[in-house]
Amino acid sequence: VIKSGEKLSYKLGTRGSPLSLAQTNWVLDELKKTNSSLKFDIEKITTKGDTDTRPLFEMEQKGIFEKEIDRAVSEKRVDFAVHSMKDVPSTLDSSLTIACVPKRESANDVLITNEGFSLDSIPSGSTVGSSSLRRAVQISRKRPDLNVKPIRGNIETRINKVIEKKIDGIVLAKAGISRLGVDTKHSILSKDEFLPSPGQGALAIICRNDDSKTIEMLKKIEDKNS
């Protein structure tokens, strides 16, 4: 039943990477389960993190994957945005709010190799790629005999470097391969031994804090446990 004055058409902003689009489409599918009349228009927005090819730890990381998208929300060019929670800064623009955190994926990191090695069993001298300083430090601390190399690119690009044997392994978030439906040999890294990034595996849906209709619509897929 459509309520009088109910808003049914929304525009949202997201990065154009395969993972960002997969996350966004998952959110839209969940929202449509709450109301099949909802219609969404996706606007792909390029961020600084998409165009700067330096290793992430050489960049000023605050807002590199979300600032341009949040600006579009704030300026009312889009109604809401879907982010990885770990990319959201601790302080948002005063006009914005995290309207919803839907069901969270695993927070663990994984090691991907062609052989399915664990971090304990991967041979000494192997080269392991990581886009994150946090992961690089933890790999080196646990296995100082490995060569840790900065690696950029979307998840498929990084995995292909392993398949093509340009690198022996990569460490990335399990949530990424789960959301993309990527079937690849991997070893799950224990959170006790390999601390994930705060908010890893969770999504944050951002909208304007005075947009009560959008907030009400988004709250329907809030997962309190996440």
Q: What kind of region is each of these model predictions?
A:
Residues 55-80:
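Short, structured active-site "lid" loops
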Residues 63, 79-84, 168-173:
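Paired acidic/hydrophobic, glycine-rich loop segments that form the ligand-binding mouth/hinge
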Residues 11-13, 81, 99, 129, ...:
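Short, well-ordered beta-strand segments
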Residues 76, 83-88, 202-211:
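Ordered, amphipathic secondary-structure segments that act as subunit-interaction surfaces
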Residues 2-47, 51-54, 58-60, 141-226:
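Small-molecule-sensing regulatory modules
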Residues 85-86, 94-146:
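A conserved helix-loop-strand patch within extracytoplasmic ligand-binding domains
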Residues 91, 138, 180:
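Glycine/Thr-rich phosphate-binding loops of Rossmann-like dinucleotide-binding domains
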